[in-house]
Amino acid sequence: MAEHPTQFRDHHELAKLPWFDLEGGELVVDPSIGPAIDVHTHLALSYVLPTRLDLNREWPRTEHYLPLERPLDLDVYANRNFSAEDLKRLEKDLTLGAVTASGMRRTHTLPNLAREMRGLSIKSSVLLAIDFALLSDNAGEWLAAARGKPEFVVFGSVHPYRPRVAAQLDRQLALGARGIKVHPAVQMILPQDPLAMRLYRLCGERKLPVLFHCGPVDIEPPLGRYFSQVRHYRRPIEKNPDTTFVLGHSGALQMEVAIELCKQNPNVYMEISSQSVSNVRKLLDEVDPTRLLFGSDWPFYHQAIPLAKLLIATEGREELRRAVLYDNAARLLGLAPSAA
């Protein structure tokens, strides 16, 4: 098995890996690698005011939160690649920018995501909405924007403290939602909060998987870091055996604890975005291979970053690669199996 570099001067140097190339300055992958399903993406999030962005507008260049010209290390947790200035811009774009139609977020649209997907043989991307109890409807706006676009699967968002939670779930389900996203650090709620526990039960009754942001990432505010501690997810998982849970980022910086949760509970999947090459290898070796999912956290990161990590980690293990890239997610989401 060949040794591959994991450190690059910029994102475009990923083309040094045997699976990638550059076409017109854009990273592309050997088509034989696909298809893939990315279960962890976002569009521009809007709060307080309805979105002022056109989510169906194409921009010439996507402004990822980790700029493409930034040096890239694949064998650290992904956010370690941010500079201090990158983090300042990210925070401003996600807070003050969330009420505007400007900033980096204006490029976080369906056509820009679709363009990246095409070059990387990603057949489907799951859009993960995040909403507050009041003053946001990202789920409704994304469901409307993605209507008639089969390459996109939308996970809705219902804050546990929102009135008429069951009716809101049914509304989003009727509009095409295929699951629900829960982000304790952003929504400011403990995973085991009684109202959150009710939400998980209702999701299980409707066969809607719950994708958690799971684990601390060390760049969030202290309270958000506390809410994301993996120990807080045990009770929701164990008390809702009929609900399927996906641990986004595989527990982030507490991956070992998340691995044990997955081993002990058959209703848990692990999603690998942001983990290092070494940690992806560990997940492949220790977790049930039918419960591992590929994800990117676009637009924080270019989709080629986690793809490169997985391709390095699965070299010589093509059946496992196919399962993680596509088959496991297709089965979970009810999508067509791959032809491979």
List each language-model region with its residue ranges.
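Acidic-and-aromatic substrate-binding clefts and catalytic sites of carbohydrate-active enzymes
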Residues: 102-107, 131-137, 159-165, 187-194, ...
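Histidine-centered divalent metal-coordination motifs
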Residues: 40-46, 213, 249
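Mid-to-C-terminal alpha-helical segments outside catalytic/metal-binding sites
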Residues: 1-35, 49-104, 108-115, 289, ...
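Active-site gating/metal-coordination segments in enzymes
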Residues: 12-18, 119-212, 216
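Catalytic pocket-lining loop regions of alpha/beta-barrel enzymes
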Residues: 15, 19, 178-182, 189-293
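Conserved, mostly hydrophobic/aromatic
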Residues: 40, 117, 172, 180, ...
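Active-site neighborhood of phospho(di)ester-bond hydrolases with catalytic His/Asp-centered motifs
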Residues: 36-41, 127-128, 155-157, 181, ...
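Ligand-binding grooves and catalytic loops that recognize ribose/phosphate and carbohydrate rings
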Residues: 167-177, 187-199, 217-220, 226, ...
